[in-house]
């Protein structure tokens, strides 16, 4: 989902039509279930939870703790967890995970 948010943010900054982008990319090698499921919701600013951000944070914390106990470094997990935690501090914990796009829309 982080990749989807970053791709949409980049495409938006380049002035691309995001609806066309979703239709084009979804049928190719860059397509994914995350893109199909959350891309349209993100474009509509539909942050109704299928899975609450606050619960996803809890799960990522457990995974991060387990990784550390196993002496495994999961840099992407740590970064994504920090991004979500920042949004939770801003009061977005009861939104769906697709609200991660709000992290990228900050001024």
Describe the residue ranges of each PLM region.
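Helical "substrate-binding/catalytic lid" subdomain
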Residues: 1-107
